[in-house]
Amino acid sequence: MESNYQRTLVSAFLNISVDQTVETAIKCLKSTNWKLEDAINLLFAIDRMRNNQTLTLKPSDSTRLPSLSPPPPLNLLFNGSFEDAKLASSSKDLWLLVHIQSETEFPCNTFNRDLWSNEDVSQALEFRFMLWQVYDHTSEGRKITSFYMIQHFLIDPITGQNICIWRGEIKAKGFLKDLKKYIDASPHEHIASTARNMRVKAEKICHSDQQDMVGFTDDDFDDFDEGNLSSDSVVVSSCGREFDDVVTLSEDEEETCLSSDLFEFPVLTKEPKGDCDRSVVCSISVRFPNGRRKQRKFLKSEPVQLLWSFCYSHMDESDNKAFKLVQAIPGASKTLDYGAEASFDQYGIANSIISVTWE
């Protein structure tokens, strides 16, 4: 300790927190820049984490509980379940950074000390990210690792999609480089940008097709020997060079190619199973153009874009073309907007019937 003031803070910490050691007090105070209130809150946060994890351990495993060295970054850390972390980060428009710690792997225990405490990393994360930590031997830790199967990853809280992963030891400089594009745009801004890019790409493809047709002259068509052309291939002469075996696509094939180029829907989250709380889960019935019907449960808090992902995943390859979703309303209909920044509940389509129609 460097000063009488710091000794006073340690004494105050020990008076408030019963049965704690001087070493624990110093570690908590140092990690919070010698702010007494933050240090006490940090200790309570660690105790809550320990209590939650103790429920999943055998008595013989109690010695495996994490030590206070090094402590997690209180200003970045979210205290709660994974679902709560997704909801909180989505409402605050922050990326959710998930760190699954292991007591058996040394690098996992150095993140708080070497990575999260790095000044540049801390500043970057505080601006755009929320950090959620869990140990892999806990019930929630096992559930998350079985679903995502990795230890350090970045989650889009709106879609639940895993969009970036890290393995092993992570250096601050490389970590910041990986996060740059997520620092530049929040989750909602990222979705809006993706929707705009899809529209721009469609416009460019249409414009390119028009330019290709403008480039042909009457002389080009006069050069064709119609008697030698089959119904599905042509030889195009341009600038003195000939390109053989140029196959023209049918209308359905063109739409299929266009669709595969344009559609980049978010990855579907896992469907809620069993008896679900109707206050948090909704059921959507989808009617496809060929008469098929599919039903699927979603969390009411999940983004409506997942409905497009679900419909697209159930289309046959021959049906893989541009489509729109229409909500069946008595006496009217409502075409859904893919760019809507809303959940199923907010958009008013929870427990409704949706029809898929071709554009």
Curated annotation (Swiss-Prot):
UniProtKB keywords: Ubl conjugation pathway
UniProt GO BP: proteasome-mediated ubiquitin-dependent protein catabolic process
GO MF annotations, alphabetized: ubiquitin binding
SUPFAM superfamilies for this protein: Thioredoxin-like, Ubiquitin-like
An example Gene Ontology CC term for this record: nucleus
Keyword Ion transport among record annotations: no
Keyword 4Fe-4S: no
InterPro entries: Thioredoxin-like_sf, UAS, Ubiquitin-like_domsf, UBX_dom, UBX_domain-protein
Domain UBX, first and last residues per copy: 277-357
Listed PANTHER family: FAS-ASSOCIATED PROTEIN, PLANT UBX DOMAIN-CONTAINING PROTEIN 16-RELATED
Name this polypeptide is given: Putative plant UBX domain-containing protein 15
Organism: Arabidopsis thaliana
The encoding gene: PUX15
